[in-house]
From Swiss-Prot:
GO cellular component, one term: membrane
Gene Ontology molecular functions: serine-type endopeptidase activity; serine-type peptidase activity
Induction trigger: By methyl jasmonate.
Entry protein name: Subtilisin-like protease SBT2.5
Sugar-modified residues: N503, N577, N701
PROSITE patterns: SUBTILASE (PS51892), SUBTILASE_ASP (PS00136), SUBTILASE_SER (PS00138)
Amino acid sequence: MDIGLRIFVVFVLLVAVTAEVYIVTMEGDPIISYKGGENGFEATAVESDEKIDTSSELVTVYARHLERKHDMILGMLFEEGSYKKLYSYKHLINGFAAHVSPEQAETLRRAPGVRSVDKDWKVRRLTTHTPEFLGLPTDVWPTGGGFDRAGEDIVIGFVDSGIYPHHPSFASHHRLPYGPLPHYKGKCEEDPHTKKSFCNRKIVGAQHFAEAAKAAGAFNPDIDYASPMDGDGHGSHTAAIAAGNNGIPLRMHGYEFGKASGMAPRARIAVYKALYRLFGGFVADVVAAIDQAVHDGVDILSLSVGPNSPPTTTKTTFLNPFDATLLGAVKAGVFVAQAAGNGGPFPKTLVSYSPWITTVAAAIDDRRYKNHLTLGNGKMLAGMGLSPPTRPHRLYTLVSANDVLLDSSVSKYNPSDCQRPEVFNKKLVEGNILLCGYSFNFVVGTASIKKVVATAKHLGAAGFVLVVENVSPGTKFDPVPSAIPGILITDVSKSMDLIDYYNASTSRDWTGRVKSFKAEGSIGDGLAPVLHKSAPQVALFSARGPNTKDFSFQDADLLKPDILAPGYLIWAAWCPNGTDEPNYVGEGFALISGTSMAAPHIAGIAALVKQKHPQWSPAAIKSALMTTSTVIDRAGRLLQAQQYSDTEAVTLVKATPFDYGSGHVNPSAALDPGLIFDAGYEDYLGFLCTTPGISAHEIRNYTNTACNYDMKHPSNFNAPSIAVSHLVGTQTVTRKVTNVAEVEETYTITARMQPSIAIEVNPPAMTLRPGATRTFSVTMTVRSVSGVYSFGEVKLKGSRGHKVRIPVVALGHRR
């Protein structure tokens, strides 16, 4: 190789190493907001809450024009081969994603016509019985024609890890075939191996987006699949929660754990894969997926995804390519549900911030999988387990994993985890109950209960016990289905009782080797769930408010999360090759937790509301869900939230709107809310333009809109909640409600607040005809400065039975 060629190769390698993905937004409106003005191109803008007519010649021509402009600026600035354009964004934002060097990114930043240049950043996943818990089969589905029609003709788009199309939760109906779906125009990719489409009548769209992942060197086609195939499990699970078929038998290991159903079992599924097994995803791919989903005509977007960290160039949480794209989606009439994040129970851990998004927190529902271990001394130890019992009226010998090793030298494998059957003496284990240790390896995923089950079965054990000897804050113990008797003892004191009994009953020689095993026990039946009334509760991991307006963590005048939905131990479809949860590798269903599971609950319920009220805006649907939610649990008490005590033990405390938003979703009430707090694109711009610290220049960069909208204070944004982060003296905020009932109704308005802040409403009552809109005001005055937020609510009680409630949060300051 001559010296010149060698230098060239080194130069190319350096460019490849230093190049990164950047998202560039341009001057000029995207399709959704272009009102004309460029020579030869007629307007394509839609009114607020209207879908884009992608079949229109005007849209097609303008889309080509935008893409040519993207190509032109790259071609003018850089030599061919020194960059790669990954996507053109045309529908919701005007811009593109490109793989360029930092120097080229700086050149773009200074180029005429460029609004912003953001370095791409990563996103992550935010990881049955709940239809009954939410009252869907008896109170909601019948209003839409039963489960056979629940969600009919509504398309839910999932930006996630793909789908396993062969699962029965996603099968086409033959008894009641689906009809045509003229408003949806998405396409279906083929499986590159089988050449079969990923779609059927249930799955109506399936595409994948991985250009940014490939450019970053993160994509592995062997495990990530260059297709909509789910290589993780997460995407199949979330799709089934929202829109999986009804009545699918949930069978594992020869046992049935009930029947699975989505919230809207007749809704159609559109798949936009942008998340992957090992690395999560990249915003450039996610934005492309959202842009395509709205272009295709989805009605609802379910996002169980959130940013790892903000882009370095972003000053505010509300303005970046991701949130700006979602603002465009909402302008096009698409309802967006996004997971709140799993950073709880600590404050300001949300990863979903903007007023146009419905941010969903996770609740624990009324189901627990409890079990017990009965010892030979008569003591009964509580634990958890999804397993059958040992034979009745019989005790089995207990043998510790460390006492039945073939060779003590295998201790380097951490044998007490019971992950490797070959290190144990089968003769000593067979017919007995194997005692294993629940170490930190289970927490980080290098050990799994599934492997404990496999080890115990291979050795012929009568069952197994997992003992927790110490626990750190945040350790999550979830029951895992087992084909053999098994139990997890999560209480450290109970574990010590078992260990003490075992040691006292076991005879050893002077070297410590066991001479005889005399400890005995039996495992109870853990297959059936135990229902309780202290539900719902806010899950420990669910991210908490207050919401933040910038990455200095200054509080925003907007309440988040918005609403609470089930997100703990949720049964739903899984893909056999999914690895997101090691306990469910190779399984068809999984029982997992996260705000990732809560968001599709709201997406599915929003589909039911959309089905009944097809003309409602995303804000109207959000309002209906929030104002009819409940802050009372099944026992009639105020909602509680899991929290850490001073000793770092998990305890329950009184929950606040920073935990649950407006409250726990009540689907049947959301179908008939009485009043709605509506908002549109101009209202969202008004919120941005009046939020302190956000410059008009930055707003124009991401929305191509001047700040001609002034609502005086961001707290005046017409949200179904009120948040004032800096209340000094007296402040009045206004809200506007619309009667969506079919009859005239008179509402009495009342308000209450914690003592440090006085609250008044005006007028105290108002009458609204069907379709009429009225305004009321809420005045708050600081009585005393406590340094903590005060919580309250405004209630509107209708003469015909409607009850509307919005939460109020305010932080008083001295003048």
